[in-house]
């Protein structure tokens, strides 16, 4: 599974890379984030595995996409 954030304002994608077979063996805190993200949002990261979720960033919304290879 490839995990990436999409900035819904600029449409830029930030690839978080593949993590194991399902990603479940990686702590959200281990994910190397780039850009303006709120770390506290990652507490809910694995709660939204497999579906799309919107988080409020410092200046805009960020969309989390999970794509199966």
Model-derived segments and spans:
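Short, basic/aromatic beta-hairpin or loop at an interaction surface
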Residues: 1-21
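Short, solvent-exposed secondary-structure boundary/capping segments
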Residues: 54-67
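Well-ordered beta-strand positions in beta-sheet-rich domains
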Residues: 23-25, 45
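Short beta-strand-centered aromatic/proline hotspots
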Residues: 44-53
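Short, well-ordered loop/turn sites that connect or cap secondary structure elements
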Residues: 26-32
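A structural detector for beta-sheet-dominated domains
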Residues: 5-6, 27, 49, 65-69
């Amino acid at each position: 599974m490839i995990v990436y954030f999409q900035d819904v304002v600029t449409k830029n994608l930030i690839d978080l890379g593949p993590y194991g077979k399902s990603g479940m063996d990686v702590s959200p805190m281990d994910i190397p984030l780039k850009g303006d993200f709120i770390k506290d949002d990652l507490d809910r990261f694995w709660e939204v595995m497999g579906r799309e979720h919107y988080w409020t960033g410092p200046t805009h919304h960020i969309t989390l996409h999970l794509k199966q290879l």
